[in-house]
Structures are given as structure tokens and as C-alpha cells.
Amino acid sequence: MITQLQDYLAKTYGIHFNNPALLAEAFTQASYVNEHPHENLKYYERIEFLGDAVLQLFVSEYIYRRYPELPQGKLTRLRAAMVCEDSFSKFAKECHFDQYIRLGKGEEMAGARNRASLLCDIFESFIGALYLDQGRQAVEQFIQTVIFPKLDLGWFDHAVDAKTSLQEFLQRNGDVAIEYDLLSEGGTENDPVFEVEVTVDGKKVATGQGSSKKHAEMEAAKHALEKLRMDK
């Protein structure tokens, strides 16, 4: 299975491990080690510990540089959305890491291969093994392929307000003028409705409604992001 994993990593990501034992350790659960007591095997927990720290650092550094206007609180929320069990388990599935985990028979029968917590652990342990084997640059190349493009796909929009996401999306290739114009104000005193239009370099992109001008602007930005991503 580890040989197959090596072939898969080489073919898919151009990754060639110098020390296959690190890769084997990263994809081995304790239950497998317990069922093979005479093979002197190691399981992933120590490497996972390292991988978690590496991911925290690299993701923190990336979003710090990418979002120079984002305050500390919003950076923290964005990092928390990117560096979490839900995200890592999805990345692991996308990378097909679930197919290469070495599990004990009991854990296999219990469906551990699809367990989010295990997939998260395996993703972290792989990063730890890659860092030990090949260093910072290899890890950065991998996460630039697997993690960071998800920012442009809207995976983490819930952690950053839509206006910030729209600004970052549009200004990657240079400055553009983004304006929010109030189109109408209606409803009742207890249930007001505001409608706002967002324009980019003078061109109308989308509108949004909300119970306040701020909420309407957020909705307009959200709709603009959805439209621009579909058109991309």
C-alpha cells in the first residue's frame, strides 16, 4: 500500500519521498501497529503533532501576507476555518489519502477510513512527514496546490465578510474601484428593507437587500462574488 502511495504522490503531485519510512509512519494508525507487533512499526501521532504546527504557521503566514488590511480578529477567524478538522478531512478526501491509510481490522470494519477525525489526523501527519523529508519549500508547494486555491473558490467566505472577500478577489491583479450605492430604502420602521448595488470600475455587477445598509452591502458583495466566480 505504501508503494502505491509513493507512486500516486509522484504521479499526482511530483512528490518523491527520500525516506519512505516517514511516509509509512504518517499513514499508519495505532490499531494497525497493535495487530503487527513483530514488525517494529510506528504510527502517525508524533508526526501529526509536527504537521499541525507546520500547517498553523504556513497558513498564518500566507493569509497575513495575502490580506494586509485584515485585522487580527478576522485573520484568526479565517485561520480557524482553514486549519480545522472539517477542512483537513475534506482535503484528505480530495487527495484520496483515505485509500492509503493502514488500519487494524476492527477499525476498518468500524468505518474509520471515512472518519473525519482520522482523515484530519492523516492530512496533518502527511504534512509533518513531508516537512521532515523535504523541508519548507515542498510543503509550501503542496499546500499552494491543495489548500490556498480554496480561498478563491469561496470555501472560507463564512470566516471573512463578503465585502473583504470581494475586494481581495477583484484586486489580485491590480486596483479596481468598488462602490456600493443605495438604490432604495423601503419597508416599515420595524422591518426596513434596503437595496444596494455594487459596481466595479463603474460597471454594475450585483444588488443585495438587507435590514440595514450594511447588511444590504454584504448581500450585494456576496452575490457579486457568486456571479464573478461563475463567469471566471
From Swiss-Prot:
Residues in RNase III domain copies: 6-135
Source species of the chain: Limosilactobacillus fermentum (strain NBRC 3956 / LMG 18251) (Lactobacillus fermentum)
Family: Belongs to the ribonuclease III family.
Gene3D superfamilies (alphabetical): 3.30.160.20, Ribonuclease III domain
Protein's recorded name: Ribonuclease 3
Main location per the UniProt record: cytoplasm
One GO cellular component, as annotated: cytoplasm
Taxonomic lineage from the root: Bacteria, Bacillati, Bacillota, Bacilli, Lactobacillales
Localization (cell): Cytoplasm
PROSITE patterns: DS_RBD, RNASE_3_2
Top-rank taxon: Bacteria
Gene: rnc
